[in-house]
Amino acid sequence: MLIVLSPAKALDFAQPPVQAPLTAPQMTEDTSELAKVARKLTARDLSRLMSLSESLAKLNRERFQAFDPVSEEGLQAAFAFNGDVYQGLRARELDRKALAWAQDHVRILSGLYGVLRPLDAIQPYRLEMGVRLKTKRGSTLYDFWGEKVSLALNEAAQGHKDRTLVNCASGEYFGAVDRRALKLPVVSCRFLEEKDGQARIISFYAKRARGLLARYAIDNRIERAADLKGFDAAGYRFAPELSTDEEFTFARPQPPPPAASRNKED
């Protein structure tokens, strides 16, 4: 079983380092090619491509200017990303054995790196998968990555007892998975909040729940997708009446709204 997550827009490179292995991303040639394109973009270009404020556009232009795709330095991806998914995952709390299991069973989709393992070293960047960035391979990042993301996922699942790909990524990022090239069965997960007799998806809660589900799989060393039905963190329960073989649905009573001070950039 292999779980795929989206990255986060919010990054945290300021926390004290965690004593954990640092591995090299596996698609460095592609990342180098993309970085060359991104390095030519102005702050205005970045603002237009990703709807960034002037200050964020300048920051990310500086990041691309400093970006070194072959550097052996960086921070582990699971520790660097700081959005809602990663608040649920809480990777910094994992011990070495749990991190080793996650390294084999979790993948993070990335506009710049393609496919990341949790302990792969990344540098600060922002390049959303859905941007229309022209390269030699096409006019979007979906064109750029083509079959490569799917091929990397196929390889990552080799040797697993259950080769199911558990989709806990957003539609934007899972769109980079070419289903024709993917040789794995896919199960998607959705998370519903129930209130006043209605059930709906609320983005913030759904993102957090994806991280919680990945953490549940890591803590319990889940090897079969079907065993994820036991997920019960934060009040969620598997809802068989709302689920299919291709989509697992989890539901719970909707909690009170989160604090207004929460970091909105994910």
UniProtKB/Swiss-Prot annotation:
GO biological process: response to hydroperoxide
Transmembrane regions listed in the UniProt entry: none
Chain spans, region Disordered: 245-266
Name this protein carries in UniProt: UPF0246 protein PHZ_c0561
Superkingdom of origin: Bacteria
Entry's family note: Belongs to the UPF0246 family.
InterPro entries tied to this protein: YaaA
HAMAP family in the cross-refs: UPF0246 (MF_00652)
GO cellular component, one term: cytosol
